[in-house]
Curated annotation (Swiss-Prot):
Main location: cytoplasm
Positions of ATP binding: 119-125
GO molecular function, one term: ATP binding
E.C. number(s) listed in UniProt: 6.3.2.9
Disulfide partners: none
Lineage: Bacteria, Bacillati, Bacillota, Bacilli, Lactobacillales
One Gene Ontology CC term in the entry: cytoplasm
Protein's recorded name: UDP-N-acetylmuramoylalanine--D-glutamate ligase
Localization per record: Cytoplasm
Catalytic activity: UDP-N-acetyl-alpha-D-muramoyl-L-alanine + D-glutamate + ATP = UDP-N-acetyl-alpha-D-muramoyl-L-alanyl-D-glutamate + ADP + phosphate + H(+)
Pfam assignment, any one: Mur_ligase_M
Pathway: Cell wall biogenesis; peptidoglycan biosynthesis
Length: 450
C-alpha cells in the first residue's frame, strides 16, 4: 500500500487561487499544515481569499511579494496557470523549496489508483468516456483534474476501491515529482500553449512527464496515428498499449468500420454516440483503458453508444427550423477544428471561427475549409482566418462577438444546414475562457429558438 504523505505542521505556500488553489489550501489546512495563500487579485475582488481568511487561513493578496518567501516555507503548491518563470516560482526554486501542482498533492494524500489522461485535443471527452465506462462496469470512476473538479478535492474522499480518472494539462504535469498513474493516456500531441512553454520540445516534455514514474506493471496508451508516439514508445518503462485508426496495432484499432481490441470486435463507428473522426480516436483510447481494466464488451458498447458528448466539445445543442447547432468552443487550435469538420458534409456547414491572435497562420486549415457553405469570422485573428478562407474559396461575414456570429450564421442557413462554432483559436481576446464563449453561443441558440 502506498504511504500517505504527512503534512502536519508543515509550512506550505499556495501560490494562486482559482478552483485548484482554493481546494489545495483547504485540504492542506485540514491535514494540519501551516498554510499561507498568495494570490494576485486584490482582496476586495477576491471571494475565494475572503472565504479562506474567514476559515482561519492566512492570505496575502494584491501581488506576489518576494519577501513572503523569507518565511521558510517547506513546500509551494503552485496554480498550474502560473508559469515557471514567475518571479515567486524562480525564487522558491533558488531557495530549494519544492514546487508542485495540485494533482501531485492529490496523489500524495490518496490511496485510490489513478488513470491519467493528457493530450492536445480530446482529453476531456476521453476522460469522461473512461469514467462513464468504468462506472457502468462496476468500477467507480471519479472525474477530476483539469475537467473542472479539483483533483485534491476528489482525492480526499476517494478510497482504494475507487479509480481517480484525471484530466491532466501540460501545466499540471510540469509540477509532478512522485505522481504515478496505473494507466496513462496521451490522446495526441500538436504545438500549442507555446506562449507558456516556450517551445514545442518543452511542451512535449511536459506531456511526457505523465509516464515519469510508471513501471512495467503500468500501462501507457498512445496514439499510433502519430509518428512521435511510435518513436517515444521505446522511451518508457511502462507497458505501451497503442490505438490507431490507420493501422492494425497490438491494442485498439479500426478493422474496416469496426472498433476492435486485439481481435475482439467491440462496436461499429456509426454506433458511437458523437460524430467526428476525433471521437473515433477518443473511443479507441477509451476501449483500450476499459479492456485493461477488465470491462466487458457489451458495457463498453452501451456506454459509448449512449455517450452524448461534453459541453463545449462538439456538443449537439439542438435545432431551430431544422438547422442544427453544434458548440465546439473548446476548439482552441487548428487540429481541433479539423477534427470537428471531419464529421460533417462541408456543403451544409456554416463555420464560426476566430479568436485570440497568437501569430500563427491557418494554412493547414485551408483544405478542411474547402466547400464550406459560409464562414462567420470574429476576434483578433480575423485577418489571418480570412486569408485561409480566401485560399479555400469560402465566402464569409464579419461578426462582433459569438452572439452576433450565431445570429448571422442562422440567417444564412437553410433546413438541413449546420451552424458550427469551432473557433480554432483561444478565447481570451474577448472572453475569460472557452466556457464563457460557448455559453454565449448556447444563449444565442435559445434566443433564436424563441
Amino acid at each position: 500500500m502506498k504511504k500517505i504523505a504527512n503534512f502536519a505542521n508543515k509550512k506550505v505556500l499556495v501560490l494562486g487561487l482559482a478552483k485548484s488553489g482554493e481546494s489545495a489550501a483547504r485540504l492542506l489546512d485540514k491535514l494540519g499544515a501551516i498554510v499561507t495563500v498568495n494570490d494576485g487579485k486584490p482582496f476586495e475582488e477576491n471571494p475565494a481569499a475572503q472565504s479562506l481568511l474567514e476559515e482561519g487561513i492566512k492570505v496575502v493578496t494584491g501581488g506576489h511579494p518576494l519577501e513572503l518567501l523569507d518565511e521558510d516555507f517547506e513546500l509551494m503548491v503552485k496554480n498550474p496557470g502560473i508559469p515557471y518563470d514567475n518571479a515567486m516560482v524562480v525564487r522558491a526554486l533558488e531557495k530549494k523549496i519544492p514546487v508542485i501542482t495540485e494533482v501531485e498533492l492529490a496523489y500524495l494524500i490518496s490511496e485510490a489508483p489513478i488513470i491519467g489522461i493528457t493530450g492536445s485535443n480530446g482529453k476531456t471527452t476521453t476522460t469522461t468516456m473512461i469514467a462513464q465506462v468504468l462506472t457502468a462496469g462496476g468500477q467507480n470512476g471519479l472525474l477530476s483534474g483539469n475537467i473542472g473538479f479539483p483533483a485534491s478535492q476528489v482525492a480526499q474522499t476517494a478510497s482504494s476501491k475507487d479509480m481517480l480518472v484525471m484530466e491532466l494539462s501540460s501545466f499540471q504535469l510540469m509540477g509532478i515529482e512522485d505522481f504515478h498513474p496505473q494507466i496513462a493516456v496521451i490522446t495526441n500531441l500538436m504545438p500549442t500553449h507555446l506562449d507558456y512553454h516556450g517551445s514545442v520540445e518543452e511542451y512535449a516534455a511536459a506531456k511526457w512527464n505523465i509516464q515519469k514514474n510508471m513501471t512495467a506493471d503500468d500501462y501507457l496508451v498512445l496514439n499510433f496515428n502519430q509518428d512521435w508516439a511510435k518513436e517515444m514508445a521505446s522511451q518508457t518503462q511502462a507497458t505501451v498499449v497503442p490505438f490507431s485508426t490507420t493501422e492494425k496495432v497490438d491494442g485498439a484499432y479500426l478493422e474496416g468500420d469496426v472498433l476492435t481490441f486485439r481481435g475482439e470486435a467491440i462496436m461499429q463507428v456509426a454506433e458511437i454516440g458523437v460524430p467526428g473522426s476525433h471521437n473515433v480516436e477518443n473511443a479507441l483510447a477509451t476501449i483500450a483503458v476499459a479492456k485493461l481494466r477488465g470491462i466487458d464488451n457489451q458495457t463498453i458498447k452501451e456506454v459509448l453508444s449512449a455517450f452524448g458528448g461534453v459541453k463545449h466539445r462538439l456538443q449537439y445543442v439542438g435545432q431551430v427550423n431544422e438547422v442544427a447547432f453544434y458548440n465546439d468552443s473548446k476548439s482552441t487550435n487548428i487540429l481541433a477544428t479539423q477534427k470537428a469538420l471531419s464529421g460533417f458534409d462541408n456543403s451544409k456547414v456554416i463555420l464560426i471561427a476566430g479568436g485570440l491572435d497568437r501569430g500563427n497562420e491557418f494554412d493547414e486549415l485551408v483544405p478542411d475549409l474547402k466547400g464550406l457553405k459560409k464562414m462567420v469570422i470574429l476576434g483578433q485573428s480575423a485577418a489571418r482566418v480570412k486569408r485561409a478562407a480566401d485560399q479555400a474559396g469560402v465566402s464569409y461575414l464579419d461578426a462582433t462577438d459569438v452572439r452576433d456570429a450565431a445570429h448571422k450564421a442562422f440567417a444564412q442557413a437553410e433546413p438541413g444546414d449546420i451552424v458550427l462554432l469551432s473557433p480554432a483559436n483561444a478565447s481570451w481576446d474577448m472572453y475569460s475562457n472557452f466556457e464563457v464563449r460557448g455559453d454565449e453561443f448556447l444563449a444565442a441558440f435559445e434566443e433564436l429558438k424563441g
